Amino acid sequence: MIQIQLNGEARELPAGTTVAALIEQLGHAGRRIAVEVNREIVPKSRHAEHALADGDVVELVHALGGG
C-alpha cells in the first residue's frame, strides 16, 4: 500500500495504482479532468501508464464548460 495526498486529503492505495485507475475508482472515468501529480500536469495520454508513488501529492480538477 502507498499513501498519497488527494486534493489535500490522505488516501491509501494499492502499490502500482495508476492515475487512470484512481480516476476510475473515484467514479470519474469519461469525465474531463485535469490531473496534477507533485505540481506537474499529467497529460491524459499518460494516465494509464503513470503509476502513483508513496508520498505523491495529487490534485484532480474537473473541467467545467460555460461561457
Identify the function of each model-found stretch.
Residues 1-66:
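Ubiquitin-like/PB1-type beta-grasp interaction modules and other compact soluble beta-rich domains
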